Amino acid sequence: MTHDRDARCPMCGGADASLRYRITRFEVLDCRACTLVYLWPQPSPEEIRAMFATLYTTGEGSVPELRDYYGYCYEDAPSNPLVQLYERWLDALERVREPGRLLDIGCGTGLFLAVARRRGWQPFGIDDCAEATQHAREHFKLDVRGGDFGDFASQGHRFEAITGWDIIEHSRAPVELLGAMRRCLALGGVVGLSTPNQRSILDAVAGLLYRASGGRITKPLEKFYIEQHFLYFTPETLAQALGRAGLAVAELRRELTDLGRLTLSPATRLGLRALFGVARLTGLENRIFAVARAANGAQMG
């Protein structure tokens, strides 16, 4: 794998970072200026595109537990836990903005857009994965195209809502991504985001094992810090990124991964359920969900 040489923080550009963990393929760094946690070295843009070209057919290959995770992206049924999650996220969007034109960046198979359409949204999607976008068009009959959001954002389209579920952690330039999302908002529009929470029970336990072993026990960390995720946000750093992009938080909450979507041994599932119980009590849930809108005075496109 080739890597860019510049180790500056992807959010603030700071060059001063401390080492949090050193694991098999990369280091986990803390920016001393803005506190963003990020991986180093990071893959090149070409390698990033290759990673996601077959994501929905192969999953995130370095994590066997995600083998079946993407299978839930194909079935629009009330019993599907992913559909239930999307309904909750749409509830949050609709508390801030009534349905209108909706763009889902990284829309994948189109399941979220199909759920949104039933609720009165006018859906549109964009994704780099050709197999997924084909499914969205043929199975869900959605207006979805392949390609890069950066190119799309310059074409003057406007939406009442723009969503990016689990995309910001894949970005090498998160503030620029969020700024482009803001510029594509119609007046009064909203942005919806989800991403892993770096300050989670998973990092806490894996980090404890790493430090107690003098850095020799890294396997638990390698389940959490994976090469497809370049950035790891906390609620505070995600709010900071939104603010740097001219967006103001309307709602931000912590959530837990649905273990039913993961491929786990019975013992691992039981252990994670216990950890997630602790997470609920301590505020160390492993996911972040946010809704934001253009800050006062921030210019939209």
Residue ranges of model-derived segments:
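S-adenosyl-L-methionine-dependent methyltransferase catalytic module, highlighting the catalytic core
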Residues: 159, 172-184, 190-296
